[in-house]
Amino acid sequence: MPKKKVSATKPGSPTQQRLWLMYPPKLIKQPFIWEVARKFKVVTNIRQASVTDEIGIVCLELDGPRDEVKAAIKWLEKNGVNVEPVEISVMES
């Protein structure tokens, strides 16, 4: 009997996504990472951060069900945070 294929893109399947978050000056003091962890079923892990009065740049890992991670990203973008996927892992070297 052939094995049944399981799709890795199911909404509830677990995923980990590493992202760059870029905050404009007016949003730097907002606790977005805390809010994401409270509003969505995701675990946040700050991998790297640089925050000044002019800009905030954060490398953030989000772990959780795929649909929750997508919703968290959409919520961040809706609230004015620029979200980009990390293309290469320069953090580990």
Please state what every model-predicted region is.
Residues 1-56, 61-93:
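Long, contiguous binding/interaction regions
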